[in-house]
């Protein structure tokens, strides 16, 4: 399953939040890819970088953050851990690690 299918799966009922997520994640992906492309000597996996950037905030759907149209029950600080659980359930453990570790020290 690609990142678009995963976002569509979890965000089908909240178009406003989906738009916010896609705009933010696209900006993160552009920045991450720009940085990665400046270092061809590292042989980075650009496809993985794009996918991970697009999915890093997937867990916000389960949080309570009405200012950004999130109406779940969990504290926002947990969105990385929640997203990691979602991505592991989708068979994406490598992406899950990025998700759970992008918020501070990964202790959310």
Describe the role of every protein-language-model region:
Residues 41-108:
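Divalent metal-dependent catalytic cores for phosphoryl transfer on phosphate-bearing substrates
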């Amino acid at each position: 399953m690609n990142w678009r299918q995963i976002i569509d799966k979890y965000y089908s009922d909240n178009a406003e939040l989906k738009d916010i997520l896609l705009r933010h994640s696209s900006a993160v992906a552009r920045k991450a890819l720009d940085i990665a492309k400046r270092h061809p000597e590292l042989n980075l996996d650009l496809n993985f970088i794009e996918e991970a950037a697009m999915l890093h905030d997937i867990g916000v759907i389960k949080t309570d953050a009405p200012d950004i149209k999130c109406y779940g029950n969990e504290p926002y600080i947990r969105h990385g851990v929640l997203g990691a659980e979602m991505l592991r359930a989708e068979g994406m453990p490598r992406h899950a690690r990025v998700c759970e570790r992008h918020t501070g020290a990964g202790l959310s």
